[in-house]
Amino acid sequence: MTAHDPAAVFDPAAYARGVPHALFRELRETSPVCRVPEPAVGPWPAGPGYWAVFRHADVKHVLRTPGLFSSHLGATQIRDPDTPGDLDFVRAMMLNQDPPAHARQRRIVAAAFTPRAVRELEAVVEARAHALVGAVARQGAADFVELAADLPVWTLAQVMGVPEQDRRLLVDWSNRVIGYQDPEHAASHTADPAELTPMGRAALAERPASPVRADGTPLNPRSREALADMFAYAHALADRPRPGSVMARMREGGLSRAEFENMFFLFAVAGNETLRNGVPGALLTLLDHPGQYEALRRRPELTASAVEETLRHWPPVMNFRRTATRDTELGGRHVRRGEKVVVYHVSANRDERVFDDPDRFDITRTPNDHLSFGFGPHFCLGAHLARTQTRAMLRAAVDRLPGLERAGEPVRLTSNFQNGLTHLPVRWRTDR
């Protein structure tokens, strides 16, 4: 694999060293739609390869044309589900639906994520962020990944009605699903059974003893088999939902069993992990641009636009897959029916055709047509809540940790999907 080989955009290890922005820049110019192979990665088998899409306009075209580029046919992850049964199961997820089925599921829970609903949460989210930062302010140092991880888990628990004692289960499920390519997260077991509710302990007993089957093949981390404990918990929680919570809406929404389980999966994992990756990434980006950090410190009114620019610069999710429903042309290439098409938001967000000086980090940038929350019918349902949490955590850190700076090298998540950090050591002055 050479420095200019498109195959590098699939290699999870490449992202552990940093997003290959120089390669994306070259591919936008020379091969804006190109074939990328899928070699075996560790115990995971090779795949048939896919069409990678790098330019902003082409990414938008794919995302807004579900009749041509389906989320349902092969689901939305690069890697194919292991079996036809696994594919049938994950197809029930809202994320993996095409219109009109997608809209039916989205309507069931959409009211919990409207701007008005999120505004009602804003004060408690901000208070929680300041409490988290205040609890460590006198220490002078922390791992910001660990510090910031509590806010999305806490917020998700509030929205879903998950008891405080069971919040660590959400962390473990996210780690196992999103971080399966990273040895630090692949077998996450941070929940202490002694601290869980009886409902949580009963669910934990359903967790597979090993991420590997008896025949030596790995469990698909997104399968019903691998997540038996999560789905057991989902059903138990639905039997006692807090009125008005997302769980109550799901229970009353007429979902099938598979739809219900997959919707719980979507909120418990995507609603958690995206922020766990995005908030530390946003802070790291600011720390690496001291002038912009200082501007944000002095001018709180720039917080909203700063969040948009950190999202553009550090999209928490780097790509999503679609499957061609018929033969078509895309970026001058012939795509056949049934072939995978993977759009790279992380590349589109730096497309020179859309963004002036795209590698420049500028918290006053306007307009800022980034695609970090997607586009079209699958635009992120939780975008308003994600923005609120990111603003709250960044503002708390900037305002309450004087002289905030790196205290060592960050450690990146090994993943070709999530743009994450596993560690971000920081320090600050404790002179006030």
Placement of each model-derived feature along the sequence:
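Cytochrome P450
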Residues: M1-R432
